[in-house]
Design a protein with these regions (language model features):
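Sequence/structural signature of beta-propeller domains
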Residues: 20-549
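Intrinsically disordered/low-complexity terminal segments and short unstructured peptides
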Residues: 16, 353-355, 521, 549, ...
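C-terminal outer-membrane/trafficking sorting elements
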Residues: 8, 555-567, 571-627
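Bacterial Sec-dependent N-terminal signal peptides
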Residues: 1-20, 613
Length: 627
């Protein structure tokens, strides 16, 4: 994975090694060979929004007049609300983009706690984007607007993931779970009790006038309006937890929520009326229950303490659920479970004492046991479950889960990896070409009849091969985003196609396809020593996917070829061999240009357009044409 990092943001070339490989300096180029076309990528990368640099328009807050200030940093989730006005669509207006800021701080202008920024996006000539100047209903004018939480629903915090529904409705998730006013005092100045319904016109039916501790007004899903730059309501009836994200189903009634915790919850809410999420029934997932879900009553005390209530009733325990998305092709939900290097006693004591161990974690532990010990786990599934409960499963890489909403069954879709048997990572020269770890962001792209899963990493660490041995400093961390062709049966990490990566020291997140042409991504908390603007959190677009479909399809198809061949990844300017090989690259005069040892992925971004021959140590050849 990290061996050849090539992306629209960060490019690291592979290292050519000339020693100990018996390739002649000159060859006869008249031999016939298979021709591989390396098309010029039609993709265009464009930075749209830079934290700490771009200016956001603010509302009157804490006695300060409305005005402007620099945007917050730590960009995370991206939501998108499509434009529906035909006249605006005809001028290129795409819709409203809204970005979470996971940074928590006291701020006189944008409000304390976390935050969000909203802006409108337009596509102009080709795939060039521009930010649309707007005047909002509250009179603010400009390009970027702070979302007002402080004057509407009370301060928010830890804005991490969220829900970006197909119908344009947006919820932001307040992830980092808070247990006292002392915990929040560093980022929220007013820790006095909060009365529900005092700052929003509609409040929340059934809970208006209820008094709660200030910290208890954090860790909810919060609906926001990107068009007005204001929060609408905290979703008290969905329960209070360390939510990372969720999905709204096509029935416009059913919501699934994912908690980033060890143990973490999988929650479902079903509205009584489509589109009205102020009334309905809440459930927690319990895999061993007959109907897979246990009901949670709509009582404020219960909802505030959802985690302890659900686990006391035997809810299934997950290892840090992150983002999820509905695959509109098959109707199933896919959820990232990022893993935990050292769960310790989290599944055994406290909240975990009465929760149920997830079946897929038992299976993952048994598979790991087989790899490490060379023999099957000797005990029963119950014994393996006890091992997981006792903290024996060090979940270094995480996985992607599949939830079937018709049955309530959760299974592993594919595991991260490959597993490395030592804490010390391999060096670059022996590092695997694909190493997928700690999945976080997840979404889907639908391009010319094909369905692709978009995934992003947020590494929990750099050991255990999550970064090569030479790149173990925090400022050297590189997280990547991948595509997976959903037509592949029983996929593994080896089926992934790298599409972009973040600048050093950051995580890549927010990935969303706003249509068949453009994907948006965020880079969060990069190393401050990076070149501007990549030393800031930022939002960027990669456009032109509709012109790349054939090349992407060929990439996935060619990976199963048993003969010596190569297949292009024009997204990342990489040429991937179908097996690890020693190779030499020759120009069409027969002159040796490059030699590589033990490689499977070759950087071709520095080759001038033209024809070349690739020869392996067995003398097998393929011809590539770089456009």
């Amino acid at each position: 994975m990290k061996k050849n990092l090539l992306s629209a943001i960060f490019i690291a070339s592979s290292i050519a090694t000339m020693a100990q490989i018996p390739f002649p300096v000159k060859i006869d180029t008249s031999w016939s060979s298979k021709t591989i076309w390396m098309p010029k990528s039609p993709l265009k990368q464009q930075v749209l929004f830079v934290g700490g640099v771009d200016t956001v328009q603010t509302t009157a807050t804490y006695g300060n007049a409305a005005g402007a200030t620099v945007a917050k940093q730590w960009h995370d989730f991206i939501g998108f609300t499509p434009e529906t006005d035909p006249a605006k669509i005809a001028t290129g207006d795409l819709g409203w983009v809204i970005v979470n800021h996971e940074m928590v701080e006291k701020n006189d202008k944008v409000g304390d706690g976390g935050g969000m920024t909203t802006f409108k996006l337009r596509r102009v000539t080709g795939n060039v984007m521009e930010i649309v100047p707007q005047t909002l209903t509250d009179g603010r004018s400009g390009k970027f607007f702070n979302v007002d939480f402080a004057n509407t629903v009370g301060e928010t915090g830890m804005n991490c993931g969220g829900i970006s529904a197909d119908n344009g409705r947006i919820w932001t998730a307040e992830e980092w779970f808070q247990s006292s006013n002392t915990q929040i005092a560093g980022g929220v100045r007013d820790t006095s009790d909060f009365v529900i319904g005092t700052t929003t016109p509609a409040g929340f039916p059934g809970f208006n006038g209820k008094t709660i501790k200030k910290y208890q007004n954090l860790n909810w899903m919060v609906e926001v309006d990107p068009k007005t730059g204001k929060a609408i309501r905290k979703q008290y009836n969905w329960g209070r937890a360390g939510y990372e994200g969720g999905v709204l189903m096509n029935d416009n009634k059913t919501v699934y929520l994912f908690e980033d915790g060890t143990p973490g919850l999988l929650i479902k809410f079903v509205a009584n009326t489509a589109g009205d999420f102020t009334s309905g029934q809440l459930y927690a997932h319990k895999a061993d229950a007959a109907d897979k879900w246990i009901p949670i009553e709509n009582n404020l005390d219960t909802l505030i303490n959802l985690k302890s209530v659900a686990f006391k009733r035997g809810a299934t325990m997950y290892t840090r659920l992150e983002w999820g998305a509905v695959n509109k092709t098959n109707g199933k939900i896919y959820i990232t479970e990022t893993g935990n290097d050292n769960p310790g006693s989290a599944f055994k004591s406290g909240l975990g004492a009465t929760g149920t161990i997830a079946n897929h974690l038992v299976l993952a532990y048994k598979n790991r046991y087989q790899i490490v010990n060379g023999t099957s786990f000797p005990g029963t599934d119950a014994a393996a479950s006890d091992s997981v409960r006792n903290g024996a499963f060090k979940d270094y890489y995480g996985r992607v889960l599949e939830l079937d909403p018709t049955t309530g069954v959760v299974r592993t879709f594919f595991e991260g990896g490959p597993y490395h048997t030592a804490s010390a990572s391999q060096g670059v020269n022996s590092y695997p070409n694909v190493h997928f770890s700690n999945p976080d962001g997840l979404n889907f792209a639908y391009i010319k009849g094909k369905t692709y899963m978009i995934m992003q990493e947020d590494l929990n660490g750099r050991t255990w091969n999550r970064m090569p041995a030479e790149y173990q400093a925090g400022t050297q961390t590189i997280c990547e985003s991948y595509l997976l062709d959903m037509d592949i049966a029983n996929p593994t990490y080896s089926d992934l196609m790298r599409i972009t990566a973040c600048s050093p020291g950051a995580e890549i997140t927010g990935g969303i396809a706003i249509d068949s042409r453009t994907m948006l991504f965020n880079v969060q908390h990069p190393d401050g020593a990076n070149t501007f603007p990549y030393n800031n959190s930022l939002t960027y677009a990669i456009s032109g996917w509709d012109g790349l479909t054939t090349a992407v399809e060929e990439y996935f198809k060619s990976k199963n070829n048993s003969l010596f061949t190569a297949y292009p990844n024009p997204v990342a300017n990489e040429l991937t061999l179908n097996k690890v090989s020693d190779i030499a690259i020759y120009d069409m005069t027969g002159k040796r240009v490059k030699v590589y040892r033990d490689v499977q992925v070759v950087n071709v971004s520095d080759l001038t357009p033209g024809a070349y021959l690739i020869m392996n140590a067995d003398g097998e050849r393929v011809k590539i044409i770089v456009q």
